[in-house]
Amino acid sequence: MGFDLDVEKKKENRNIPQANNLKIKVIGVGGAGNNAINRMIEIGIHGVEFVAVNTDLQVLEASNADVKIQIGENITRGLGAGGRPEIGEQAALESEEKIREVLQDTHMVFITAGFGGGTGTGASPVIAKIAKEMGILTVAIVTTPFYFEGPERLKKAIEGLKKLRKHVDTLIKISNNKLMEELPRDVKIKDAFLKADETLHQGVKGISELITKRGYINLDFADIESVMKDAGAAILGIGVGKGEHRAREAAKKAMESKLIEHPVENASSIVFNITAPSNIRMEEVHEAAMIIRQNSSEDADVKFGLIFDDEVPDDEIRVIFIATRFPDEDKILFPEGDIPAIYRYGLEGLL
């Protein structure tokens, strides 16, 4: 039996912003996407509604999302897509009306998934296409497989990215392999996947709260839309600094993250935000902003926001940026550093 949207919608209010009736939704697609939004709900994101989408009824029942959508009831009978993206795609097409119903009156949607499996890889492009057709600002933040997950998952992920980028405004790819480079060698596999979930959380939270949280230097929906509408592949940078040089440390970490696989200075548009306690000094704001500027093109359209947040420790500053509108997005989605590994797996001709 599938989920009824009205029955399964949770009663609790997650502070969806009422100003201008702005509605932002985060859709987790497939097993990894459902896990990611469960993590986001646990940690918290201000002003968004969570939607879980899956072909696997058992996994969907474990979701804490505000809304749950079982797709492809006739095709999969609630048993999942079996790692086949074509089944995930057919399932989403079968349930198109359910998806459209959930997306009504939405201004911005985040689609998050782990690519390489069946439901997330196959259904995400369909959901994105529907959202774009409805005039919704559509942003996808997806992970690609660890190499140890095998060549077939990598191949499916690449093919899925090629489909997805046709139907989103902005596509942010997070490489699990690059993420692993930032983890200690003795990290447990469970913790590695948790780190991937946390990175997805930071990305969605960082972008959405630019809009939903009132800033001291404010960025509104129009600012974000100007950077992310029809922007193509994008780069996300996140940094946290502590102590005496917290501003410099946060900005440098954001710009020098191993997740960044392409020079940021090639971007035509950048939006960045500083989240800090109210004790932040003017010189710290200037220092962080200059590091971002120095790593950007002189001609780039750069937008800046500042949010005071009581939840940030007194000795800490957080910096996030999104860089968009690159001349060659293939170099972002399929960087040359990945090509030798891809060839090792016998995937010649895909790129």
Swiss-Prot record:
Keywords, comma-separated and alphabetical: Cell cycle, Cell division, Cytoplasm, GTP-binding, Nucleotide-binding, Septation
Classification via InterPro entries: Cell_div_FtsZ, Cell_div_FtsZ_CS, FtsZ/CetZ, FtsZ_C, Tub_FtsZ_C, Tubulin/FtsZ-like_C, Tubulin/FtsZ_2-layer-sand-dom, Tubulin/FtsZ_GTPase_sf
Subcellular location: Cytoplasm
PANTHER family: CELL DIVISION PROTEIN FTSZ-RELATED, MITOCHONDRIAL DIVISION PROTEIN FSZA
SMART domains listed in its UniProt record: Tubulin, Tubulin_C
Function per UniProt: Essential cell division protein that forms a contractile ring structure (Z ring) at the future cell division site. The regulation of the ring assembly controls the timing and the location of cell division. One of the functions of the FtsZ ring is to recruit other cell division proteins to the septum to produce a new cell wall between the dividing cells. Binds GTP and shows GTPase activity.
Organism: Thermotoga maritima (strain ATCC 43589 / DSM 3109 / JCM 10099 / NBRC 100826 / MSB8)
Protein name: Cell division protein FtsZ
Zinc recorded as keyword: no
Binding of GTP, residues: G31, A32, G33, N34, N35, G118, T119, G120, E149, R153, D197
Primary localisation category: cytoplasm
Similarity remark: Belongs to the FtsZ family.
